[in-house]
Amino acid sequence: HFPNIARAVREVARVLKPVGLFLLVDNIALSDPELDDFDNRVEKWRDPSHGRSCTREEWHAFFTQAGLVVAYEENFRKTHNYDDWTVRSQLPAEEKAALEHFILASSDKIQHSYDIKTRSDGHLESFTSNAILLKGRKG
């Protein structure tokens, strides 16, 4: 949701005490262009204020450029119940249906990567996204 992520990380580094730590938890896109595009299109569709889900490599570059050393990293996956996920953003019913159709019509590669699950009635039940925890300290 930051319009300039690199600048935001630089500002964190600037105000961080010399012994301070910066902990970041965020969704990430995968480095594959098709998966990156899918992730960011889905997030933006659900939440128009979404800026960009960065890749792991982009986050490392932001930290490095800001003078932060990655002291710890954990990559993990989060499963989202589709109905709950869209309710939280107050997505209108017609947009929810259109987004569901887009997700269900995605390529086999996307279906597998995001572990897209359907209910017995054919509607989208859940999908799994990628996230990262980074702990940075001043270099």
Kindly label every feature range from the protein language model.
Residues 5-6, 35:
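Conserved strand-to-helix beginnings and helix N-cap segments that scaffold or border functional pockets
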Residues 51-67, 73:
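Short alpha-helix
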Residues 1-2:
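A short His-aromatic
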Residues 21-45:
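Conserved class I S-adenosyl-L-methionine
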Residues 48:
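Conserved catalytic-core motifs of GNAT/GCN5-like acyltransferases
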Residues 6-21:
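A short glycine-rich, Lys/Arg-flanked "PGG" loop and its adjoining helix->strand segment in the class I
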Residues 66-139:
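Conserved Class I S-adenosyl-L-methionine
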